[in-house]
Amino acid sequence: MNRQKVGEYFKDLEAILTERNILYKPKLVWNIDETGKSFKHDPVKVIAEKGANNVPGHTSAMSTHVTIVACVNAAGERMSPLLVVRGKTERSVFSFNTREAPSGTMWDFEENGRMDDSIDERWFKEIFLKQCGTDRPQVLITDGHSSHESLALIQEGIREYIAILSLPPHITHYLQPLDRTVFGPFDKQYDRACSEFLQVDKWTFPTLFKTAWYASMTA
């Protein structure tokens, strides 16, 4: 980890928060990050009698990719999640049991199941601006992914008095709040939920995601 870059980042962050008079207003400081999940997962550890050779554990052979986008503030409040599924048309979303996802979940699609500029801009308008409250200014900390730095998104942030700050490259894993405090517990909860199902597919995934989402967000 580059200590100089880390030091510079925290100086910049403090300056931005101080300039906007929100240094001690954690509800106005947000962090967005994404993680990926496939229907092929690692089973949780199974306790068995010593010497047992074949210990059953539920896994899925499918590997469909879903990108999960989360946003939380420094006070511990969360926004509705965004799920990006793999597909070329809206029909790819309809194949999921979307009603079983957490309340308010936003669904979108992309050929590889990844974030892109248009999805990020839609998320900013339809989730972030509607759920961040009316206080201004605010700060949104991102991981530096190109979709979070599009010109259209930055301009929209300026219009809405939302400062968008990127984490330094190559060391986001060390500094990313969601990586450090949410996605780790989420992964464990997700694998635990999956282990109780015989198969993980487009119909069962939203239920499994909801179980892990609420468990990790309230831990």
Regions found by a protein language model. Give the residues of each.
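Phosphate-facing sequence motifs and polybasic nucleic-acid/acidic-lipid-binding regions
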Residues: M1-A219
